[in-house]
Amino acid sequence: KKSNVNIGFSFSKEKNRIRIPVPKQIFGKIEIESELGDITLGAVQTDSLSVFTETGSVTVRETQTKKMDIKPELGSVKITRSTGDIIIDNEMGNVEVAADSLDHNFNINNEMGSIHISTKKEPSDLFISASSEMGSIRIFDKKTGAFRAGDQTKEMELKTEMGNITVEHSN
């Protein structure tokens, strides 16, 4: 049985920190909204993860999900060792994704900030499309805006108006 949990908080002082331990189970949906403050999520299993923040960085690590939808207005995004389709719509801040493999769909749109994707495994079934109005693009050490491997059933679309885009192998 999948669970949904709703928890609301409101603070008027600065530098408040909330830590919410959750039981080890698979959640149907996790939604996190914040006006101000950094959000860190780790070691969670959920079908759907949705994170919105007006001002603050978002960090997601070791999270298994079918779909991850992250929308910060002002702040960086860092995703490490997590699985599932990723949608990021960021107005200002860098985006960094470190994955073991690129076997999910990615749609990352960044108005102002760089996008950096690193993977340990060579992609075998992926199409990458990257565009930057003001910045450089490097995909696996080549100055190109496109990459194709295998049947291309998985897609990665990377866009930034102002910033560099890098997709590379990591150690």
Where are these regions (language model features)?
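Short, surface-exposed interaction patches in beta-rich subdomains
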Residues: 68, 79-171
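Right-handed parallel beta-helix
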Residues: 1-67, 76-83, 96, 144-171
